[in-house]
């Protein structure tokens, strides 16, 4: 039974629950104990731009050093950059200090293995077992050393650009890039600018507090307005740690993760390089399923979370998968979700077909989908309550085969997520609120 690790590492409000300096120190030590048994005894640490990153970086650094591991600091860098540099430095592990799309007062810690993928469940459980033991520092001559990777940003920028076909250029394209005041603020604009685009940046002035605040992939209003006002060809919105992407076409319409998956799958199929099909999640829009089916592209759903998308991709030996929230995996171009690289792959498809973003999405019709988050911090499971089950069954009967209902607990926040999908937007919204009220009545 997991006590500390959730579906995406450890995450919570800073100074409360799990996210304390004491736990970070002990976690660094416990992870160091497990990781030092094999390999290079070298660990990379990256973080996003939230103010508490300094605190947790220092605590993790001290804990790892106390266990005898050498630490290499990257400073503010996107999560996928940590995965990439963990591989290229042959480090034993990479550590990301980030709460992704959450507000600044939250933070989290997650690990990558030496190949840039997320740690196996068994390794996380082994770390949890070490956490229960008293901290014992190694002898002084065995303590780890700490250094800084001075050219981390430049290395990752070149890696990102390497995913764009050399025979094409972004010359003539005007792109709005929203960095969410997060870890991509000094990376993403340079990548697209160096590939030839005219880049207008927003969300590129982090102050430790403003990460994800009214900007980024979870708040699309500002980028939509900017794309229209600047008469840009498209917009690319990243989240606080750069592992997810949402896009905006020139008319200000949001292009979400499902539509991005459709673009990438069609492009790969047209080039004859699509291996198998596409993995989505239980939250993926039914429209994606139908659009892929029309092109004879297999589609499978995993549980929600990029960890589970990756598991199903490996099980089926497919390459492309992701979530409608914008986590996009393409295993021919990396080992984890990468917002910048996903954007580059969409732009490459546009260049190959000499098509606009809206033209690339003409073949997919998204069904109205409403997601309602209900805060629930009780100890019992509201999804098993008779009143909630009854409300769900009632809605499902009304939707028939042209809709879906999905209720699930968030893996990272004290929320119950209510998703309803169907043909008529107003009905879908009413159905979602009806079920949400049944859950709220239990609080």
Swiss-Prot record:
Entry PTM: Activated by phosphorylation.
Catalyzed reactions per annotation: alpha-D-glucosamine 1-phosphate = D-glucosamine 6-phosphate
UniProt entry keywords in alphabetical sequence: Isomerase, Magnesium, Metal-binding, Phosphoprotein
Cofactor note as given: Binds 1 Mg(2+) ion per subunit.
Names of the cofactor(s): Mg(2+)
GO annotation, cellular component aspect: cytosol
Active site residues according to the UniProt entry: 100 (phosphoserine intermediate)
EC number: 5.4.2.10
GO biological process: one example: carbohydrate metabolic process
PANTHER family, alphabetized: PHOSPHOGLUCOMUTASE (ALPHA-D-GLUCOSE-1,6-BISPHOSPHATE-DEPENDENT) (PTHR42946:SF1), PHOSPHOHEXOSE MUTASE (PTHR42946)
NCBIfam families for the chain: glmM, PRK10887.1
Sequence similarity: Belongs to the phosphohexose mutase family.
Full protein name: Phosphoglucosamine mutase
Provenance organism: Shewanella loihica (strain ATCC BAA-1088 / PV-4)
């Amino acid at each position: 039974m997991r006590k500390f690790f959730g579906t995406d590492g450890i995450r919570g409000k800073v100074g409360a629950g799990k996210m304390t300096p004491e736990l970070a120190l002990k976690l660094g030590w416990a992870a160091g104990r497990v990781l030092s048994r094999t390999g290079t005894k070298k660990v990379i640490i990256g973080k996003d731009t939230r103010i508490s990153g300094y605190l947790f970086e220092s605590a993790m650094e001290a804990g790892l050093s106390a266990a005898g591991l050498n630490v290499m600091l990257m400073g503010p860098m996107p999560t996928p950059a940590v995965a990439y540099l963990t591989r290229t430095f042959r480090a034993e592990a990479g550590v990301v200090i980030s709460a992704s799309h959450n507000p600044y007062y939250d933070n989290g810690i997650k690990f990558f293995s030496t190949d840039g993928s997320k740690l196996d469940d068994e390794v996380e459980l082994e770390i949890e077992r070490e956490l229960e033991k008293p901290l014992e520092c190694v002898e002084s001559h065995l303590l780890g050393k700490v250094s800084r990777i001075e050219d981390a940003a430049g290395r990752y920028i070149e890696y990102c650009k390497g995913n764009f076909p050399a025979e094409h250029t972004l010359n003539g394209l005007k792109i709005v890039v929203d960095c969410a005041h997060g870890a991509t603020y000094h990376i993403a604009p340079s990548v697209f600018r160096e590939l030839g685009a005219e880049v207008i940046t927003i969300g590129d002035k982090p102050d430790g507090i403003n990460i994800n605040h009214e900007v980024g992939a979870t708040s699309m209003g500002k980028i939509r307005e900017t794309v229209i006002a600047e008469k840009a060809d498209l917009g690319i919105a990243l989240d606080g740690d750069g592992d997810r992407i949402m896009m905006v076409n020139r008319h200000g319409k949001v292009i979400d993760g499902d539509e991005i998956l459709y673009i990438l799958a069609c492009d790969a199929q047209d080039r004859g390089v699509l291996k198998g099909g596409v993995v989505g999640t239980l939250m993926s829009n039914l429209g994606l399923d139908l659009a892929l089916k029309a092109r004879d592209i297999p589609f499978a759903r995993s549980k929600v979370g990029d960890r589970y998308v990756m598991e199903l991709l490996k099980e089926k030996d497919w390459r492309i998968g992701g979530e409608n929230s914008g986590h996009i995996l393409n295993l021919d171009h990396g080992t984890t979700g990468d917002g910048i690289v996903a954007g580059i792959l969409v732009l490459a498809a546009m260049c190959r077909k000499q098509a606009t973003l809206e033209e690339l999405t003409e073949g997919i019709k998204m069904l109205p989908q409403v997601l309602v988050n209900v805060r629930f911090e009780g100890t019992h499971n509201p999804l098993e309550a008779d009143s909630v089950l009854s409300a769900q069954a009632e809605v499902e009967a009304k939707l028939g085969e042209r809709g879906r209902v999905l209720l699930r607990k968030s893996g990272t926040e004290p929320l119950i997520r209510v998703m309803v999908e169907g043909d008529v937007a107003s009905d879908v919204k009413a159905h979602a609120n009806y079920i949400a009220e049944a859950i709220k009545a239990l609080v």
